[in-house]
Amino acid sequence: MIRIELNEDEIMGALRHVHRVRQNKKEFNVTDKKFDKNNSSYSVNLMGRLGEVACAKGLGLSVDESINPGGDDGHDLHTSLGKSIQVKTSTIPTLIFNHETNFISDYAILVVLEGDKQLPHVDSAFHIVGITDRKYFFDNFTYHDYGYGQRLILSQDKLHPINEGFNINEISRLFGSAL
């Protein structure tokens, strides 16, 4: 597991990005689906963006700055060899997808927030926990209901761990696919 603390510029960049995303959604009358009854849509969006920034920082990748009315295309990061990654940020050590069709990237990475999910930008750190590919996820996930319907989950112990020195361009060896 890699622990990442974001600096002020990275946090402000994430805040600006989420503000632009929300302005874009308002302009195009796009309503967020709310999947966390104990948190605001804004905080959920911000926590996710901060997790993407932390993951990119920890793995030496660039974040996607594009903004689309319907949200991003599901691909949060890309390896230098063109493989796509979805970053899933949570407060619990479990990779969660709301629906089977939501895992569209080549890989998914779990990032866990250490801090207050309602104020994810204040005194927080992020842990890049583990990675899976689509095949392994769909072969090993279970269902869980957190109070708002069945979700597809994979616990931290079933993910391939990401530790200091992890090289994202070597993931083909982990999952047997060419990058």
Indicate where each model-derived feature is located:
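Nucleic-acid endonuclease domains
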Residues: 1-81, 88-179
